[in-house]
Structures are given as C-alpha cells and as structure tokens.
Amino acid sequence: MFAENLTRIGSNVAGLFFVWSTLKRYFPRQIQQLLFNAIQRIPIFKRLSDKILEFFSPYAYIRFREIEGYRYNYAFAAVKTYLGAKVNSEVKNLKGNQVKENMSLDLKRDDVKIEEEYEGVKMWWEIFRCVKGKKICRLTFHRSNWDVVTGSYLRYVVEEGKSIKARKKKVMVLMNNPSLNWKTSMKGLWTCTEFEHPATFDTLAMDIDKKDEIFRDLVAFRDGKEYYDRIGKAWKRGYLLYGPPGTGKSTMIAAMANLMKYNIYDLELTSIGNNWELKKLLIATTNKSIIVIEDIDCSLDLTGEREVKDLKGDKEGKKSNAVTLSGLLNFIDGIWSACGQERILVFTTNHVGKLDQALIRRGRMDMHIELSYCTFGAFKILAKNYLNIDSHHLFGEIESLLKETKITPADVAEHMMAKEVDGSLKGLIRALERIKWSQNVKVEEQLQQGD
C-alpha cells in the first residue's frame, strides 16, 4: 500500500514538473505567474499539493470542529476556552469584553496562531473559520510527539477548558434561525446572546407551596443522573406552564434557567420547514439546556390532527411541508430525543384546552403547572420585592379584595412601581375595586340575559 501511494505521488509530481518546465520555456514570466496561480485554485491540484505536503511533512494535525454531524462539539468549546484564557504579559493580541456596565473587563487572547509548550514538547494552535462559517481549532505538532500530545496533553487541555468554563459559566439564550437561511447564513442553526433576567424562585409571585414543589422537582432532576440510568429512561423532563397572560410563565422559565444554570433554547416552530429540520435543531442543542416553545397553541395547528391532509391549493400544499403534531411528539420523546442528556422541555399556553391531549399527557409533560390570578400569598411576595415591606395595615383589605377579583400578578406589580408605600397600596385597592365592580356588572348582565 505504501509503495503504491509513493508511486502514484511520484508520477503526479513528475507530471507537474513537466508542465512547469513547459510553461517556463514558452510563456513570459507574467503569464507563467498568472497560469501558476490559476492552477493552484483548481481543486484537484490543490488537493494534490496538500497530499504531497502532508506526505513529506514531519508534522501531524488534529482538528476540532465546532459542529460535527450537526451536533455541537464539546471538545471544541473546551479547547477554545483553554486557549482564550492563556493571558499573560507576553501576549500581544488581546480582546476586551464587558457585557455589563458594572462588570470588570474580561480579557481573552485574540491570536489566530498560538504557540504552546507542554512537558518540553512544542506545538501550535490555529483558530480559523471554514467555508460555512463554523470555527475550527487545529493543533500542529511533530509526529515524534504523538503519544504525549494525544495522551496526557489533550486530556489536560479539555479538562482545564471545562474547568475554566464552569468557573465563568453564563446562562445564554438562543433562538433558532429561519430554516430558509440555513444554507446562506453564516450564523448556523441558532443565534445566542447572554441571558440577564434577574428572576429567581425567591422573587416568583406565586403560591409558596406550589413554588417549593417545583423547586424540589427541578433540583431532583438536576441531581438525578444515577436515578435515570437505573430506570433506563432518557435524562429529560417536561413542564407545561398554562394560565392567562401576565401570570408569570416567562418569569418562571427565567427562574428555572437561573436556578439550574442551563441555557435556554427559544424554539419558534413557525420558522421551521418540516419535521426533519426540527430534528436537526434538536441535535444541535447542548446538554444542560431548557428548550422552550412559548404559546404552543398559537405556533401550529396542534389541536388533534396527527396528519396534515393533502388538500388542493397552494396554501394547503405548503402545510404538508410544515411541522406536524406527530413530528413534534417524536421531538419530545422519540428516539432522537435521547441524543442528549439533562434537558428540560417547557411548553407555555394561555389556552390549555386547545391542545391535543397526546401532546401534554404525563410522560411527555411530566409536570402541569397552572399559573393563575394573583393570590394574597403572591401579593405579599410582590410587596416585598417592590416595596420592601412584610406587613401593612392595608393588607387586610387587599386580601379580601383579591379573594373576590381576578387580577394577574403582572397587573398587581404595575401598581407597585411607585416607591411610596401608602400611595402604591391605595392605588392597588382602587384598581381592585374597579375590577370587582366590573365583574359584578358582567354577572348581572348574564343573569338578565338568562331571564
């Protein structure tokens, strides 16, 4: 095999030398240079030259791609973090980042090429982008150091990178790019930014017992790897958040992410072309993540039809290529849903009755959480958050009115934006009295219509 490869390379090299000598004999120097540059751009000659250099080179190369087969490469992230953290007085190229005004400046290496030495072995890292825009870290080292590099060195780099990343862990929120742009855009499947929502379980305005139940369930899931391995079930969990607008569904998701330190993947189903693209997005999510589909009853027609009927007309024809209910069900708990670990899936809806029961049954959505109108317990949390008070002589009147009215926590919070305590509480009482009067009028009108 070696002899055959050597013979083939020798034959190709001889052919190149013949072409080159012919060019030098019959063409002027400028034409020679133009032709030589043109030949270099021809893919077959470029591949040939790369193979020749690789064959005779004493160096070996290891590439770490950001995406491998549509899946995120965790080794790439660890290597990139490790290289970026190697900051000292000898480094000439740095980049500074300050994501918040009151945070300290974060310095990272911004070198395209980085020289590294480990146990007396020299090697070189390069960071560059491939044709599709994804980054690649390439390690170059002498072949004689193969055992050291592929053994202890790479283990050290990956573990150190993971350790640095854990110490500087930041929650990110990602949204899926429209599938029509996947081939032309350099952004890939997901676009991300840092998540800065301050919500915590302490500040959530909801029933304390229900909040504690959700908190304990999340912690048990986070610490449940051995449990899920023992029962032979994929390490994932589903939560259905339902209730009127303004009851804190999005805030609950933010509190979940801040508690778990998981990234949020905000999945917009209407920008996905078909079920295959939905699977592709799932594969591209990372472990320790929360996949969110907000207002799922508005995203697609998921009210009971498992298949989209093939009706006439362009409008109906387009539907056949869209995400179907069966595709979404496979996304939740099909074979492909087990391609990662430690994932949480969250659906939100204002109208739970509109959803197909197959979508929200136990096992898919393990916990159904109703976020309803403001209770007195939720009000007390809001009063502590906004006004920094635990009690007040107007609390009794407010408690009585809350039992007789329907008002969301968001509306209650709006009346507490003023820092003056008495004025805020009195304004809330007036609002509750107006709501109570309006509700009574509606009841009387309904009774009159019934008569």
From Swiss-Prot:
GO biological process, one term: response to stress
GO molecular function terms attached to this record: ATP binding; ATP hydrolysis activity
Disulphide-bridged cysteine pairs: none
A Pfam family this chain is assigned to: AAA
Cellular component GO terms, alphabetical: mitochondrion
InterPro entries from the UniProt entry: AAA+_ATPase, AAA_N_dom, ATPase_AAA_core, ATPase_AAA_CS, Mitochondrial_chaperone_BCS1, P-loop_NTPase
SUPFAM superfamilies: P-loop containing nucleoside triphosphate hydrolases (SSF52540)
Domain of life: Eukaryota
Reaction(s) the record says it catalyses: ATP + H2O = ADP + phosphate + H(+)
Keywords: ATP-binding, Hydrolase, Magnesium, Mitochondrion, Nucleotide-binding, Transit peptide
Top-tier EC class: hydrolase
Cofactor(s), by name: Mg(2+)
Hydrolase among keywords: yes
Residues binding ATP, per UniProt: 243-250
Matching CDD domains: RecA-like_BCS1 (cd19510)
Transit peptide region: 1-48
Keyword Acetylation included in the entry's annotation: no
UniProt protein name: AAA-ATPase At3g28570, mitochondrial
